[in-house]
Amino acid sequence: MIEVKYTIAENAPIASGVYRLKLEGDTSAITAPGQFLDLRLPGFFLRRPISICDWDERSVTLLYKVVGGGTDWLSRCTPGHMLDALSGLGNGFDVAACGETTLLSGGGIGTAPLFGLAKCLLAAGKTPVAVLGFNTAEDVFYENEFKALGVQTVIATADGSCGTRGFVTDALLEQFDTVCACGPMPMLKALCAKTDKPGQISLEARMGCGFGACMGCTIDTVNGPKRVCREGPVFGREEIKW
């Protein structure tokens, strides 16, 4: 973990209430897909944790949904604006633990970290396939970006306005060895009830400090209490008490 002063290179809407934020600066602390940044927003006491969608040697891309005052303020920031962030937080996905074919299942904004994971899987010679769930067509994002990587991608919407009608569990692809998922807890529970394949689950939680000191994001696991910000956000599916 390091503290970095990032410069906004891009901050633009990509779907209903969802923005893509590209930051330029030091990314050396980012070592795995599924990690996150904790952004300091002026006027707000707590930092805002946002999962990493993609990164390279000079920039990091985040996707976020406007859900309150902090993210509303963030959505108004323009290129050139400086943001203070704690970078490279959390325990990310273990690419080596993924099978030859890995199902990436994302729900809403939980799709974000799976894009970076897809790129890492491809770089490791593995085959990711994606099933992404949204409420309606206006909410869909990154379908084309996944497909541009050559990833077989299926979209499910609750109202049937785009792709398969229903949820990610209604659109599961048949052939995969492992599963990696991120999204709302009901989606994750339903997914793990539908398939018994080994996998990794990225949990969403409210956080205080973002680096394990405050214990505010603790969950109960089969191995006792664990911090989503420190031991997570990615856990083995077998660790989670559903």
Put a short name on every predicted segment.
Residues 10, 54, 155, 201-203, ...:
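Structural signal for conserved beta-strand scaffold positions within catalytic alpha/beta enzyme cores
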Residues 2-81:
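Ferredoxin-reductase
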Residues 113, 204-233:
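Local cysteine-cluster metal-coordination motifs and their immediate loop/turn environment
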Residues 233-242:
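Short microdomains enriched in Cys/His and/or Lys/Arg
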Residues 45-52, 90-97, 229:
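Short, Lys/Arg- and Gly-enriched loop/turn segments at beta-strand edges
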Residues 69-206:
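FNR/FR-type flavoprotein reductase catalytic core
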